[in-house]
Amino acid sequence: MLWAIVLLGYLLFVVEWFVIDRIAGKPAGILDSNTKVLPNYDGWVNSFFANSAGSIAGSATNWSITLLRAVGSVLCGIVVLKFGYRYAVMIMMGLMCLCFPFLIIGDPLGGNNQLTLLRPLSKEVMGKLSSLSSQLHEGQLLGPVMAEGKTMLADGQTIDLVQGLDKNLIGTSSSIAGYALFIIFRSTIAIGGTTLVTYSQPLIASLSTQRRKSVLSNANLWGFNSGIVVAFVPFLFQSVQQAGTKYWVFILTALILIGFGILCVFAWFEKQMDPFMPQKQTKEQMQLGNQPSAGDILKRKATWKMIGMYGICLVVLVNPLTGGWWNILQAVSPASSFNVKDGVKTLKPLEGAGGYFAGLPTLAILWVLGYGMGYMVFSPFNKTVYDRKRWLSFMFFMNALMVIVIVLFAATLGVGTAVGFAFVAIATFIGGSFAWSMQSTILILPHEFKEYKRSEVSVLFGYIWGFGYVIYTAFDITNSMFLEAPKLANPGMKGVSILPGAIAGVALFAGLLLAAIAIVVTLPSSYLKNGDELVSEMTKKWKLNQWQFLVASKEKNRYADLLK
């Protein structure tokens, strides 16, 4: 029951994390006397930005959150030792609820929020927008206005707009400060939510059998994957996208209240934890060394090998869910596969929904649903007595291969054609099956290494997730710099191709996956364990043609000896 509640809290975090981006809306733009169509001011981005801040600044949202997820994950192990398991979970769930000020910061509040760009239209400024006169009325919320050589807010206040890296005028110093505060409070969702999946591991470690540990470790992944599906499926439809951006404050308020409800349910049902669960440390216990030392765990070589391997695993899991990956696929696609209007690419087979709305969510959903196939075909390996190194080497290689296959389909057929998008979608689904099932194998390893006791698992997973997200953040920063470099080299020019940066990003992506194999071969051996007692080492070597574990059963099956 407690495991399900903790996993539900993690699922809610994933939904919040991705839904916020889906209902962001568009920058406010700058109105002038020639503007004939009034912009749509739904969503929260227009509160802070007049124009796009570019790939690097735009990705800063993701960087800051993944870095703070790293901080939260590292701290979670320390928190559970300091306060005990029950209060650690409640603290982190409470932290998710403390994000609510970002709702106030991002809402124009009827034009009274000095941290946003939207203001009530004054009669004087309305007279300067003659081409929009039939669409305007006094007091209407509008974004910045350019008139008579001056930039002003809709209430007539003269302002200076800050230039972005690509020379666009992006916002005022106040709105950019507001955006920084928005990100800081939003990040509490990430800090608290990330730790919940870490806190599910002590519950798994307390189970009596390796098989049950394997089942729940695999099931843990459905928390993230289900959250992705819930966050992306509604936005396949443009009507939902429009409604979501219009009512973004109400949607996010509801999600925060649901999170508070989950916190209350956990506090109500929580009972005395199993003695094996991490408990609060007293000074005497620290001195006697009865409880694990977070510092000692971090010093172990196996910990850093797990961090490096899992960091690269996070790259392959998260990158295909980002706009940066979608931009790469569009950049390598033939120009003939798109309709281009006013410099905006639209997928031909999905014009009704628009390239961004339908393309990225569709591939993201297929990517996470790929785990369904992986769960049946690849994850059963976790129940075997095979040594893990060859298997993980094979999985990292296959992930690198699928990245290359997806890019080749996009480059030759184009994601803007029905056939090309279909092939990319199929390859994405297959690639997801390899990636997510590989993660399930990685997450079972700490339960099989002799280096770690059950009481140390929560601390170890905190380090794995924490420093792993540092690795992912470094990749995300580098990738966004690759994509932005062609534009920075040609400031002020429109329609600059990001193809060179896209190629560099793909090379980095696939190269990291192949480099992970060098870490895998140095991993410690896995053991069958009874609690913290070592039963036997898993020495049986897996070969490429050995897939009998798919049909192995403990009940009178000739392959039963393959199972734990």
Curated annotation (Swiss-Prot):
InterPro entries to which the protein is assigned, alphabetical: MFS_Mycoplasma (IPR011699), MFS_trans_sf (IPR036259)
Keyword check for Membrane: yes
Alphabetically ordered keywords of this record: Cell membrane, Membrane, Transmembrane, Transmembrane helix, Transport
Pfam families: MFS_Mycoplasma (PF07672)
Keyword Acyltransferase applies: no
Membrane-spanning parts: 1-21, 65-85, 89-109, 176-196, 220-240, 249-269, 306-326, 358-378, 404-424, 425-445, 457-477, 501-521
Subcellular location: Cell membrane
Membrane topology summary: Multi-pass membrane protein
SUPFAM superfamilies on file: MFS general substrate transporter
GO cellular component, one term: plasma membrane
Leader sequence residues: none
Similarity remark: Belongs to the major facilitator superfamily.
Protein name in the entry: Major facilitator superfamily transporter MPN_076
UniProt source species: Mycoplasma pneumoniae (strain ATCC 29342 / M129 / Subtype 1) (Mycoplasmoides pneumoniae)
Lineage, highest ranks first: Bacteria, Bacillati, Mycoplasmatota, Mycoplasmoidales, Mycoplasmoidaceae
